[in-house]
Amino acid sequence: MLKDIYNSLLSKKQEESNMAAWNNEDILETQAQLFFSIKSIKGLKIMDNPIKVYCLASLEKQSVQTSSIVINKDQSQIEWNEGYTFDVISSKSILALSIWQGNANVTIANNSIEGGGSSNNSKLVGKLYIPFATFKKQFCDQWFPLTGTSQSVSIHVKTSFTNSSKKVTVDDFIFLRMIGRGAFGQVNLVKKIDTGRLYAMKVIKKDKCLNMNAVGHTFTERKLLKKYYHPFIVGLKYSFQTQDSLCMVLDYIGGGELFYHISERETFSEETARFYIGQIMLAIGFLHEHGVIYRDLKLENLLMDLDGNICLVDLGLCKEGIQEGHVTYTMCGSPEYVAPEIINGTGYSKSVDWWALGTLFYEMIAGLPPFYSEDPHEMTKLILSSPLKFPPQISKNAASLVSLLLNRDPSKRLGSGESDVEEIKAHPFFKNVNWSKLLNKEVDPPFKPHLVGPLDLSYFDPLCTMNSQPINPYTINSNLSDQDQMAFQGFSYSAPDIFLNNNNNTTTSNTNIGGSGSNSGSAQNSPYNSLRNTPPSIISMMKMSGSSGGFERMSPGHFSPISVNKQQQIQQQQQQHHQPPPLLQPQPQFWVQPQHPNHIPQPMAQLPILSKLQETTFERRRSLSVNAQTQFTLVLDPNEE
């Protein structure tokens, strides 16, 4: 009987392992939660020294590292009795449990990536995958054998699955710490009260979003994250809005920024870079397969989960619907990574992502982007015409891959053909990569982050995590007009026609913009409303149980020649309609149409724009040699620091 269950689980896991197939049809209609408990473990072979054993559990990128238990040689079966709760969004969810063991007498001395990038101090014992079809039963209580181990190790697992019709709102979260800051708001580390899971809540100020003409980018990110799921792309759990802010609750990816990890070593070995680049290729290839150009690939947009796998974040600059043979002209991205055709304004397609991949790969193995300069004017010239040079330690296969990706002719660039990412996979540099195992996270990462607890933010920028407080959406007051609010219609998940104002009262919207995702009664009478008035310093000190995972940073207002000056457009409109400027009244954002953002006119194709790029001043993100501030200071008002 046990063997049949084991074979059934393996078959089901193989059937559903391609998690990239998630779409709207797979999203559950109601909120669901899975409670699981690891009761005990048996079958471990212990030599002389006692070992410590812990479990990494994950579901939909929610991650938990259990406490460690010490096991001695004479113990054949060990009681564990530790349980957690996950939020379940999709019918294709898989509960993944991996058991790790290490010497109980060894303490991890540091978190840096040593040598070729491997500093894992624990050994994988085995894994267990429990698919949705199994745990959706109300209760499950049985022993499961672990896979991927030569030992006959089994764990006793109990699960309980529940559904709820309750809508998620701001009141369901405790605000703990600010972990990222951008042009339109900030990203907060939050704790979901009922499950204890950690998430990254992106709080976007509506007025700034309107002022910077970024409503379309915000809706694009929400739409793509809601529509698709991929193992190496951050997931959207919930979205809702208040009178003055938009909120997206995203996976918290606790291993921190890849930028941080490469800064610790200056470079990665080619073997380590191959692992990360391979996972990035799978994510970008998935987007291309669905007609999406990413357009902002860089180290800062790559996070590491607790297992050491990569997660792509910030889809705000993605471009949808570009058909084969067609191009787009909007200039956007980050200056070190933009392709020549973007700078020249000749039009570009999906191959700009492969140029950025080549730049990123070069940066991983050489330490800086290939055409980097402290002078942005000089850097654009280097991107357009400078010969590509390699340090002596770069292998021939690596140099060949970079050269093919950094071909200035986009039609001849590796990956520009109809087969897209498959062209790059076939390069000799990836000869020994098992792409199926890499996609299913069955390849051991070169480095596994070690955290001392769920609030360990060691791998994030301390300028954000230590010196700033989280922002509660209810504290934002922008006094937007009804016309302004129309731009945000449809942002919330299945929200009723209400939203909460700053006084915690319920306001009915005649524009049907969608609300915070709560009805008026539950919002007004919520026992957690008092948390809005709790000082952030006190909230951040609240004791919490069990979750660790990672985070997603907000995108800055990237440079773009199509960005409009709000005041100029207002004056033009007033002149056309012969209206005097209103006195002491909020200026209207007239370019926001009173309809769904999908109907906002698309920007026209731009003529060559090298001169416009050179007129823009950029601040280099944190580099290996200069302690510069991150890109998030690029568009921030100095008074808001």
Swiss-Prot record:
Organism the protein comes from: Dictyostelium discoideum
Key words of the record: ATP-binding, Kinase, Nucleotide-binding, Phosphoprotein, Serine/threonine-protein kinase, Transferase
Binding-site list for ATP: 179-187, 202
A molecular-function term among this protein's GO annotations: protein serine/threonine kinase activity
InterPro entries in UniProt: AGC-kinase_C, C2_dom, C2_domain_sf, Kinase-like_dom_sf, Pkinase_C, Prot_kinase_dom, Protein_kinase_ATP_BS, Ser/Thr_kinase_AS
Keyword Cell inner membrane tagged: no
Location of region: Disordered: 509-588
Family statement drawn from the similarity comment of this UniProt entry: Belongs to the protein kinase superfamily. AGC Ser/Thr protein kinase family.
Bias (Low complexity) ranges: 537-546, 567-578
The C2 domain, residue ranges: 13-144
Residues the record marks as active site: 296
UniProt-recorded name of the protein: Probable serine/threonine-protein kinase DDB_G0288795
EC number: 2.7.11.1
